[in-house]
């Protein structure tokens, strides 16, 4: 499975990890996690450290994903940390961050990091992701 996720209810955190080749269709499919009421308002860490290849999405698809995500946001603010140690995923993450920030419906603050440790520090999580 290219994107695995785990829900940590104690920390109110969704931990997602990409593997292998990642496509935009898989990322859109992953958004179904956010339609689950029990994770409304949770923070999220999306780790792309193990992604070997990305089928580059168009700018329009990144905008569509950001709009879909913003429309699914809970009323309470939350945060999304994207971990992208390599340049292409980092750039795509920054594009997504920008589009999310431009959507007035968005209640989720997005930030992109090169390391899991920096992402966890920003999220305020004390434990590492295993």
PLM ranges: what are they?
Residues 1-130:
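Amphipathic, Lys/Arg-enriched alpha-helical "gate/interface" segment within cytosolic domains
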């Amino acid at each position: 499975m290219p994107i695995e996720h785990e829900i940590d209810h104690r920390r109110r955190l969704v931990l997602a990890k990409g593997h292998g080749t990642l496509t935009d269709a898989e990322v859109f499919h992953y958004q179904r996690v956010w339609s689950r009421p029990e994770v409304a308002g949770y923070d999220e860490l999306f780790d792309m450290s193990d992604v070997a290849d990305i089928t580059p999405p168009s700018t329009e698809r990144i905008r569509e994903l950001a709009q879909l995500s913003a429309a699914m946001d809970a009323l309470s603010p939350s945060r999304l940390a994207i971990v992208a140690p390599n340049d292409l995923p980092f750039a795509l993450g920054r594009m997504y961050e920008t589009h999310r920030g431009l959507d007035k419906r968005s209640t989720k603050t997005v930030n992109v990091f090169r390391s899991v440790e920096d992402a966890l520090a920003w999220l305020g999580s004390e434990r590492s992701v295993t």
